[in-house]
């Protein structure tokens, strides 16, 4: 029987073989395709990739951060999650208040210049310390703009009100499960210019059939090697959490990607991953005593039977 992880591995192969070379915002360069879809049956295991280790702890803490409506990296740092640091750090080193060493193009330079990387690491550690310990600094430079959490939980209307899209869609699933409007959008054109990183995973829709909850994500832009594995696990986890509250079983996670790309400095890592054989997906267990998705904490989420191949490191394009 075909392993479900091949949905992802086939995406990697397809882009490596048929992708178009493109320049990008980060200056790194990519090969990409436009319009690709993967499907995962969540009843047959939790799709946490096994051909490389994907840190579930980071996936879960980021999702809980989104669900809280938080847009400041302090919560993530408190949970030893550094995946959003570079975007907040960028706003700090580009500000008039920053007086440290030149950090222009720190993403690429830290990969190419060992001496610079020492300076970069020192400045990043200092930045993280200030976000954690200095409220004023955190409020100013730990903030990422109106990113996912804000749009999910407090979408601004032209009337000056706010919409809690996530709470509303959960209520709709309970009351009108056959609705075709079970949608949450993170793409607010008015707010995009002020965001540290405009939403890559832009819109998701739920579908209820035969007592099962399915979710489809439309992702405008997908970093196949680093980002997509997180996105698969994150939205699969979100589907499990909402199904739990609504008294439903889990159905499918359908992942539709607009610009699906592999960065040119990830080719070697992708080839290494493609040479590995998938292992059985793990099982996700939720604390049955927690009834609302908004009450889940890290200790309420457990992954069992996860035996992946080793992690494969790769640089982040900022």
Curated annotation (Swiss-Prot):
E.C. number: 2.1.1.45
GO molecular function, one term: thymidylate synthase activity
Keyword Transmembrane: no
Cellular component GO terms, alphabetical: cytosol
Keyword set, alphabetical order: Cytoplasm, Methyltransferase, Nucleotide biosynthesis, Transferase
Principal cellular location given in the protein's record: cytoplasm
Alphabetical list of CDD domains matching this protein: TS_Pyrimidine_HMase
Pathway the protein takes part in: Pyrimidine metabolism; dTTP biosynthesis
GO biological process: dTMP biosynthetic process; dTTP biosynthetic process; methylation
Residues that, per the record, bind (6R)-5,10-methylene-5,6,7,8-tetrahydrofolate: 223, 317
Classification via PROSITE patterns: THYMIDYLATE_SYNTHASE
Catalytic activity: dUMP + (6R)-5,10-methylene-5,6,7,8-tetrahydrofolate = 7,8-dihydrofolate + dTMP
Sites where the protein binds dUMP: 25, 180-181, 220-223, 231, 261-263
Residues annotated as the enzyme's active site: 200
Subcellular localization: Cytoplasm
Family the entry assigns: Belongs to the thymidylate synthase family. Bacterial-type ThyA subfamily.
Function of the protein: Catalyzes the reductive methylation of 2'-deoxyuridine-5'-monophosphate (dUMP) to 2'-deoxythymidine-5'-monophosphate (dTMP) while utilizing 5,10-methylenetetrahydrofolate (mTHF) as the methyl donor and reductant in the reaction, yielding dihydrofolate (DHF) as a by-product. This enzymatic reaction provides an intracellular de novo source of dTMP, an essential precursor for DNA biosynthesis.
Subunit annotation: Homodimer.
Protein name per its UniProtKB record: Thymidylate synthase
Organism per entry: Bacillus anthracis
